[in-house]
Amino acid sequence: MGNYNRKVNEMFDNSIVLNNGVKIPQLGLGTWFIDDDKAADAVKAAVEIGYRHIDTAQAYGNERGVGEGVRTCGIPRDKLFVVSKVAAEHKTYEEAMAGINETLEKMELDYLDMMIIHSPQPWVKVNQCEDRYVEGNRAAWKALEDAYKAGKLKAIGISNFLIEDIASLLETAKIKPMVNQILLHISNTPMELVEYCQKNNIVVEAYSPIAHGEILNQPEITTIAKKYGVTVPQLCIRYTLQLGAISLPKTGNPEHMKSNAELDFEISAEDMELLKNFKKIKSYGDSGIFPVYGGKM
């Protein structure tokens, strides 16, 4: 048991240094789909297991609960890395700044370790229009920069931004984004985007590293996981870590939280190439309606 705990704890000790010198734990807990009234218990369970990086968003509707969990988990605030996201619809400076302040009030926290723009387009426009909201993203980014300078945020970043979106933002940004949180998993590995971010010293974060569960239905992936003596979710999470990304598996189940951190193995270079080029899954099942999975609102 002691050896097991040591190996899991080692995983939680792994961190990446952002371009402003701030350290971010490489494995975090995603909280999408965790109800607000269950979020505090989920955060406390995760922290007890060893997680120190908690990721939420205005769109998740659980910031209050996540904040409660952070405040009552028994771990000093400065030992946790807490992230939220500016709503995708906030495309003016005023909306974004009001949202940042509202998040801090809702979570009852003095600062966030990071806040990011959730999407370059409002969700109702994703996969439906060509407009990349260049000026709106620049305005929202200015709000993040100002909140960062004021000490409300320790780091700032973006999510779901494509190369063209990042390039447009960099033209006027005073502060470079520290992360780009994207859909990244076996069967969806946009290497051009990943390499562009890495070249620009922007850390990639992987949300839905287990493809919202749909990767569990791929027999070839199950075979590779068995070869390493691990579960498919463990293989998927390890894959994103070996790409140099931060991994954010989402779950409210403490057993899954534990299992997701048992990553004391290494995928061979040969298998990494195979997984990078694995065929695209045809569907995200019932979750395919969400814009991040190609759906339309």
Regions found by a protein language model. Name each.
Residues 88, 122-297:
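Beta/alpha (TIM)-barrel catalytic core signal, keyed to glycine-rich beta->alpha loops juxtaposed to Asp/Glu
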Residues 2-80, 211, 284, 291, ...:
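N-terminal binding-site loop/beta-alpha segment at the start of enzyme catalytic domains
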Residues 19, 67-77, 104-108, 170-173, ...:
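Acidic (Asp/Glu)-rich catalytic clusters
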Residues 53, 111-114, 155, 179:
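Residues at the N-termini of beta-strands
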Residues 27-37, 86-93, 128-130:
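Active-site mouth loops of central-metabolism enzymes
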Residues 35-46, 92-107, 164-166, 188-189:
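Short, acidic/polar
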Residues 96-116, 146-150:
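CE4/NodB-like, metal-dependent polysaccharide N-deacetylase domain
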Residues 77-90, 111-120, 184:
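A short, structured active-site edge motif that brings together acidic residues
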